[in-house]
Regions:
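N-terminal secretory signal peptides
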Residues: 1-34
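Conserved flavin/dinucleotide-binding core of flavoenzymes
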Residues: 7, 14, 42, 61-66, ...
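N-terminal secretory signal peptides and thylakoid transit peptides that target proteins
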Residues: 25-50
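Active-site/ligand-binding neighborhood in enzyme catalytic cores
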Residues: 202-309, 314-316, 338-340, 345, ...
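Generic structural signal for small/hydrophobic residues in well-ordered secondary structure
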Residues: 85, 111, 145, 222, ...
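Central helical "cap/lid" subdomain
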Residues: 311-312, 321-382
Length: 527
């Protein structure tokens, strides 16, 4: 899950799955045409070019082709466009195989949406502008961090024992026990849809139920399957949870977004998927990964150079940049968000096939924002709360970002998505902080008095190098083009979280796709 809040829901669904008998005879692990885990493993071997170690679950970088003894490194001209985690990882893995690529980044700062805020808060506390949490199952980024000599902090173990999330709807607290009880009525249709849909739904492979669910919005699914529909407390909770999880109103999102996350939790599926727990952060900030990758790629990175056009030139590619320069490359890795590619780059002469162009021009991009506020104390602990909350009072959701950080102060992130983010966009952090505190006070009594006055705001939809937070599928998009995002076009490769089937929207998706792109390039050059 992209947010801690879906983790809480998944935990409750798992408890329900253990309590509710299997009345329809469907087995969670009987997913057709293939289980998610078998898909991940197959994709890792055949598409991403990585293998999963049976001992550690880590990406095996030795799966990348090595140069043969006495063989010279390839002389192909390789351009990687995008200096975020995906592009830098691809260049780093290629360099480990003796293949040198040049990375072109439009910004003067590397890292893209992996970016740590070290300047706003007192006491040396930090927050993440962008991607924040790393699952235990995110093997590619965990291995990369380890290789680079970085330490991962376990933020879950830093939570006080017995602390719980807070849910607040219709003017009243909505306890985890109540949520769990209400979920029991939803479990059977959720499980049935997951099994009948199969995983994954792609433009090349799908089931009848998968296509039907893809053509249905999350809001409609809630209205059809939750007692009381989207106006019930559980309906409101699911609506808010998925609005922030993907950064879009639930009326816009494919129901498969909900089915594949929550339907995968429960009897049988815990084995298949492993835990999803947002357990880790990089000690000192996630962008230390970026800094160390950049240091390892000294002399291979060009910043302040924005791509404006991609043209197929025989077997090569011509890239046009905003400084009016052009380069010709034998192989290209486009590690840019599709939101930027469609708005900032001319592809009229690229020769990209129709399905690829459909994915580039239509793929959803989340509208998420982060408002981070520092407090004198971690007041939420005194309320028996972990910092995680959902509410209908207007602020949507929170979590604590200072778990495993020293000091008595604490930072809460107010995380928003969809129309709430649109209403915040362009406003000053101090005004947003006052608005948040007024809306959060009924949920966290006494919180306002603890605010230090410090706040920062990350408005990703207005960030011109991202134009949003991370990718998601709108209604109907799984069957229209899912899977095409990562497909090569000749000697042009694609990387970024938006190209990752299993880790779309995660830092892991960026790293995993960079490994895959490096594999594709090295296989083509070395064999």
């Amino acid at each position: 899950m992209r947010t801690p809040l879906l983790r809480q829901l998944a935990t409750l669904v798992r408890r329900v799955a253990a309590d509710v008998p299997d009345t329809d005879g469907a087995r969670n692990d009987a997913v057709d045409p293939m289980s998610r885990r078998s898909f991940v493993t197959t994709a890792a071997v055949t598409a991403a070019g990585v293998s999963l170690s049976s001992c550690t679950g880590a990406t095996d970088i030795t799966a990348l082709p090595d140069l043969r003894a006495g063989e010279s490194p390839p002389t192909a001209r390789i351009a990687i466009v995008g200096g975020g985690l995906a592009g830098l990882t691809a260049a780093y893995r290629l360099k480990q195989r003796g293949i040198i690529a040049t990375v072109y980044e439009a910004n003067t700062r590397l890292g893209g949406r992996c970016w740590t805020n070290r300047s706003s808060f007192a006491g040396g506390q930090i927050a993440e502008h962008g991607g924040e949490l790393i699952d235990q199952s995110h093997s590619s980024i965990r291995q990369l961090a380890q290789e680079l000599g970085l330490t991962l902090d376990n933020v879950l173990s830093a939570e006080p024992n017995g602390s719980e999330p807070l849910y607040h709807f219709d003017g009243l607290a909505y306890s985890a026990a109540q949520v769990q009880q209400d979920l029991k009525a939803v479990w059977q249709p959720l499980k049935r849809d997951y099994v009948e849909a199969g995983y994954p739904t792609l433009y090349t492979s799908s089931t009848a139920r998968g296509r039907a669910l893809d053509a249905t919005s999350i809001r409609t699914w809630i209205d059809q399957n939750v007692p009381g529909g989207s106006s019930s407390k559980l309906g409101q909770l699911l609506d808010v949870a998925y609005c922030i999880e993907y950064g879009a109103e639930t009326t816009e999102q494919s129901a498969l977004n909900l089915i594949y996350l929550l339907g995968a939790v429960g009897q049988g599926q815990v084995r298949l998927f492993g835990p999803s727990n947002e357990k880790y952060k990089v000690r000192g900030g996630n962008d230390l990964i970026v800094q160390r990758l950049a240091a390892a790629l000294n002399g291979q990175i060009v910043t302040g150079k924005a791509l404006q056009g991609v043209s197929a030139t025989g077997d090569a590619w011509t890239l046009a940049f905003d400084d009016r320069s052009r380069i010709v490359a034998d192989r290209v890795v486009l590690a840019l968000p599709f939101s930027v590619l469609r708005e900032r780059v001319s592809l009229s002469n690229s020769g990209f096939p129709a399905t690829k162009m459909r994915a580039i021009t239509e793929l959803g991009m989340g509208q998420n924002a982060k408002l981070a506020l520092q407090f004198r104390t971690r007041h939420w602990y005194t309320l028996g709360n972990s910092g995680d909350s959902f509410a209908d009072t207007g602020y949507q959701a929170t979590w604590e970002v200072t778990r495993a950080q020293p000091g008595t102060r604490g930072i809460l992130v107010n995380y928003t998505g969809g129309s709430v983010t649109s209403q915040q966009s362009g406003r000053h952090p101090s005004a947003l902080a006052q608005e948040f505190l007024a809306r959060a006070e009924p949920v966290f009594p006494g919180l306002t008095a603890e605010h230090t006055g410090v706040a920062s705001f990350d408005d990703w939809p207005r960030n011109q190098r991202a134009l949003g937070s991370y990718a998601f599928y709108r209604v109907g998009q799984y069957q229209r083009f899912a899977g095409a995002e990562r497909e090569m076009v000749g000697s042009c490769h694609f990387a970024g979280e938006h190209t990752s089937q299993d880790s779309q929207g995660y830092l892991e998706g960026a790293v995993e796709s960079g490994v895959r792109a490096a594999r594709e390039v090295s296989t083509a050059l070395v064999g």
